[in-house]
Amino acid sequence: MDFSEASTSGDRVNGFAKPFPPKPREGAPPPAPPLAPGASTSQAPPPLQPPPVIESAEKFYVPGVEEKSKFRILSQQVEISNLNISTRSFNVRTEIVLLPCEKSLYQLDLHIGKCSLLPNEVPGSASKVTLNGVECEYSRRDFWKDLAQEKSISSLEPVLYEKLAENDYELQILIPKEVRKKIKHRKAVRLRVDTVVRDPPRGLQFVDFNEHDCHVFTYHTPHISGAREWTVCLDEPDQLALWELTFELEPHLVPVASGELEEKREVSENGKIRYKFHQTVPTSACNIGWAIGRFKLEPHPESPTIYTFSLPGLEPFVNHTTMYLDKMVEFLEEKLSCRFPYPTLKVVFVDQCTEEIQVYSSLLIVPTAMLYHKKIIDVVQEARQKLIFSIALQFFGCLISPAQWWHWWIPVSIARFLTSLYVETKLGTAEARWQLKRAMDDVCDYEHQWGKIVLSPPEPTKKLPLHVDPRHEYTASPLYVEAMLKKGFLTMRMLQRRIGLEPFMRVLHRVLTVGLDMSEKKTTPAAWRHLLTTTESFFRSVISVTGKEIPSFLSQFVRTGGHAAFAVKFDFNRKRNIVEIEIKQDDTEGNGRTQYTGPLSVVVQEVDGAFTHTIQIDGAVSHAEISCHSKGRKQRKKKVPLLTGEEIEIDLTNMDAESPILWLRIDPDYLLIREITISQPMFHWEYMLRYERDVIAQMEALERIQALPSAHSRSVIVDAVANEKFFYRIRYRAAFVLTFVQNRKSEALTVGTPVLINMFRESFGSKAATNIPRSNNFVVTAQNLQQYFVMQALPQAIARLRRQSGECHEDVQPFLLDLIKFNDNSTNRYSDDFYRAALYNSLASSVFPHDALPCHVELPENLSNDVRVLIKEFTYALNMDTVSPSWGRVVGAAALTGLYQLQKCGYLPLDSQLLWTFSHPNCCVQMRRCAITLIIDRIVNDPHAADTRMLDLSRILELAELEQDPSIRRMIPRLLAQTPPTIFGSENAANTAETAERLWKLCTNSSIDSCIRSGFLDVYYSLYALGAPPALGGPEESVGIHRAYVTVPNAASTFATSQWHNSGYEAARRSPPRRDFGDETMNLMQ
């Protein structure tokens, strides 16, 4: 469908809805009338001219906004022509209207990508670089030269950061003498640069599998910038400008770009079509993106201002996936009391995209891997969360953008907070609380391993004690950035809890409305500063709107890194009827922890109700006394009021008769970023699991019970698994804990069928014969969906049951094989792809190491019948999934994991070629990710793969450098950094000169994406710390900071967590969390 097809409607112009006029504001002139439907669009509006009025910047002062460049861009016109997707090239003509900020400006510094060739770099080019029509001298600068003599992080990172902080511009243009008079009078001038983009390795993705769906699109690299890869610009978030994007393309190609389509006409000379987009909201180059391809345009059926663009044949999937986009926009508009900031929203689906949605002003570039059809129910919630997060970024991220890199956490954290409100509204409080706990665990884990995260450094010139420097986008570690954004979300939520939800939303409304007002001042560029946000300006808005002073909040959680670690003990004083609490803190140097001073909330659940107290923390050791409101229990059962106000009947026979305390919780509302270890008798944890209604409390109870189960714990866990009123994540977490507890108790599985198998048969077995599962009949209601997810999780927990010898229980594999054999989806309206994948993953988890390992692998004729059956099942599933693919190839990935597990456990010969076959670019991206993850798992965790390890590692590093798909390139260093081949030390098996040289080459390769380069610096630091590798002449033990290792899931387990509800997360996560401080019982156990 061409744009002209949609222009026949009276409500549309050039395929897009007429932009709705902005809401009238007091004192503002009335909006201009919209373009008439029948009016010709061939008459383009005049080119963007320099604003005629330049007002003083002091009048529109915004705290923290500092001009980095010596000039300001007012408008930019970009024309793209001669696009050739097969040769990966196109021509770009850029015209920039800029205003000098200094009278003594003699040189213009701009950003330009390495593969964006200047006229003097193109043989035979007659193009020039001109300023107001006068030819200029220019040169390209390479700040990667002469970076480090020694091959160590300590010699590379400081030099690289200093060069980038001083001058990170690649293009230097000398201002001709003829123009200097205008510069001296600070008059706007026009710069024109013609470039040719050829085979860019980053920032642009060309997809040309076949001519029917070839396309090209932009993506952010490394994190927020990326426009420099395709045009000359100031690729900085504070350089707001008005934009005009022009595309001259073949008739079969359709562009979609930031801004509104203002013109579409045929070029008579060559038969091409000319499209012109205008972005009239001041926008930085970081938020300008586009995509070109054989897209089909579809207006959203419920909203005339939302458009989707799909590749041929994907229209039904796109329509189904984006069905609720209009409701998401309405949700955010209602919460923020503010209209959507752009006239239209365009959503384009592309192949070979990064895993995240690429967000530009009024444009979302979404990977096709997110698409699903109406028979898929497993990924709906995850996809909607990603979509609403990307829409929230249109408000905070595109309209309101950060002034500098280190303020980026503010808009993204606000967008994540808005997403959490959507999750709480649509998916429930329990899901929102579970995600909150997971974010807290991830942040504390990162800080303990790598170092403290400082959201906004108090002194931007002072280096942070980390192995890489996060103060610049091109030197920040991708793992650090990911953890920083999670910590930012937790901090933003803490702020909201302190000032209240309504005042916090008023702050966001104030920021948006001021930004929208200032964006309409097209002739006053100084006013555009209010579209920028900084830490100072945001918190000043908080104070001015709410009237609440929060200086300690800034100093404790924003300007300072680290998290608090509390070790809590308490005793009940029966004579005084009080609880005596002792709280210790640990802030040992280098472990990511910091000492907290301030209030701390404590909830004491007594037999007469729950009571909240606030105690003061003033040092490393604090003591407090809390009065109890109840006496010791007098009866066996009693109705007890909970914190939620609900009254439930509790069996009090297991508690201490002299104490009225049922359990104690510290900081239940997550008002701090912290780790907490509470030492209390096991019956407190059991009561908490059984009767507490907060998901976080139940998760904490399960973690503690798993670490130190009592004789009574097993029945409590069984009740948790069977209780259908419990949140489904608690139920399947309890199933994994039950498996762990039973595996520890040698007498647990001596006789009889495991209790989890009986529970599964009772819940999901046929009434006639419980050993045969019922036919699938998935129903999309809240309760039935939870049952469905539990049905997926129970077999995975059952598969991990082991005897004392380490062998799988004899009932497990026949049970799983029966589930696969008798699975019937013939009458079900929904797909069972994910359920079948869960069964094959369970079968893979049931495989245990062979006795003969590592001596030899048995001959095929000597394999037992059980192993033959497993091989047959996995092979059949893998082949059938190749012939008739499941959604996202989830069944094939599970079957491949099973064959890998058989190799790893010694039943099949080690053969990496099987995995490399499925990592080929011709395979779908989900299978490729699975295969590469398993290869990395073999490199890291298989001690018997020594013969293939170095070859596999070499091929993986080569793939990271040469792979076309950016999602694959970025995944490899992330997995290697999370689960390095070996830990740091002189016994490092990766300590070979070849490996060290290869890694160092990747760490200093200026051609690859900076987030990939920084990712390999994480790997390098994990292996060699800050020093040079011993194989290259470095010390055996490097001085300086080291990575503090904790128990992390292996790469294969990490892959299992890719789905938001996947129970593989519960199997793979560390459990219990670190107990290296404040838990003497655990330390003795270890």
Curated annotation (Swiss-Prot):
Gene Ontology molecular function terms on file: chromatin binding; metallopeptidase activity; transcription cis-regulatory region binding; zinc ion binding
Region (Disordered): 1-53, 1064-1086
Location of the protein in the cell: Nucleus
UniProtKB keywords: Nucleus, Transcription, Transcription regulation
Chief localisation class: nucleus
Record carries keyword Transcription: yes
Source taxon at top rank: Eukaryota
Cellular component GO terms, alphabetical: transcription factor TFIID complex
Coiled coil region boundaries: none
Compositional bias per record (Polar residues), positions renumbered to this chain: 1-11
Record InterPro entries: Aminopeptidase_N-like_N, Aminopeptidase_N-like_N_sf, Peptidase_M1_dom, Peptidase_M4/M1_CTD_sf, TAF2
Compositional bias per record (Pro residues), positions renumbered to this chain: 19-36, 44-53
Record's compositionally biased regions (Basic and acidic residues): 1067-1078
Disruption phenotype: RNAi-mediated knockdown causes a severe loss of RNA polymerase II large subunit ama-1 phosphorylation.
Gene Ontology BP terms: embryo development ending in birth or egg hatching; transcription initiation at RNA polymerase II promoter
Gene3D superfamilies, per database record: Neutral Protease Domain 2 (1.10.390.10), tricorn interacting facor f3 domain (2.60.40.1730)
Subunit structure as annotated in this protein's UniProt entry: Component of the TFIID basal transcription factor complex, composed of TATA-box-binding protein tbp-1, and a number of TBP-associated factors (TAFs).
Family: Belongs to the TAF2 family.
Primary role: The TFIID basal transcription factor complex plays a major role in the initiation of RNA polymerase II (Pol II)-dependent transcription. TFIID recognizes and binds promoters via its subunit tbp-1, a TATA-box-binding protein, and promotes assembly of the pre-initiation complex (PIC). The TFIID complex consists of tbp-1 and TBP-associated factors (TAFs), including taf-2. May regulate RNA polymerase II activity and thereby may control transcription initiation by RNA polymerase II.
Protein name: Transcription initiation factor TFIID subunit 2
Biological source species: Caenorhabditis elegans
